[in-house]
Amino acid sequence: MKDSIPFVSPKTMEASFVLPHHGEIRGMAVFAGITLIVGGGYHGKSTLLSALQMGVYDHIAGDGREFVLADETAVKLRAEEGRSIRNTDISLFINDLPNGKDTKNFSTPDASGSTSQAAGVVEGIEAGSRLFLIDEDTSATNFMVRDDFMQQVISREKEPITPFLERARDLYEKAGVSTILVAGSSGAF
């Protein structure tokens, strides 16, 4: 791949591994927990996340993809506006909807971005995922974070959505689910 740009790991995340049929390799290791990858537009954040997403599959040796590995239970989460949700408990993230809909047994034929992403998290946990891969670009902003200004405009008691970032630590510490999040526009992450 003559026009390729080699990936260079940040020194703080660099690790080496000895492979039985290849010897020692060096690269980036992302350990369990909550990892935030930030950078400007077109700096490769989403590309890196896509490589990790594909790291659940075995690859034929030769182009480097065989060295990209991710937890086999990794799931990429995104907002899927318009998707159907049936009988899913999204109350960890969404409560007190204005129309009185039950969020412990939530169903809709036409989900919003935030309800679809909340359902995706719950479905991922139920499926046994130990790693969520999230790209800010494909997420529902109001599901991911609430900034200080919005908290002043709408009090916590009146906001039905508890942002993912407020639950990420508990998801890791209590449920054993790690998160890798790539972001480039919001400092709230």
Predicted feature residues:
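N-terminal pre-Walker A segment at the start of P-loop NTPase domains
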Residues: 2-26, 61, 69-74, 78-85, ...
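Phosphate-binding/switch loop-helix module in NTP-utilizing enzymes
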Residues: 104-139
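Conserved H-loop
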Residues: 178-181
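Post-Walker A helix-loop "phosphate-sensing" segment adjacent to the P-loop in P-loop NTPases
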Residues: 54-65
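Conserved P-loop NTPase nucleotide-binding/switch module
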Residues: 125-168, 172-175, 186-188
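Glycine-rich phosphate-binding P-loop
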Residues: 25-54
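Short, ordered loop/turn segments at secondary-structure junctions
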Residues: 42-43, 80-82, 136-139, 184-187
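Flexible beta-alpha connector loops of hexameric P-loop NTPases
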Residues: 83, 91-114, 146-161
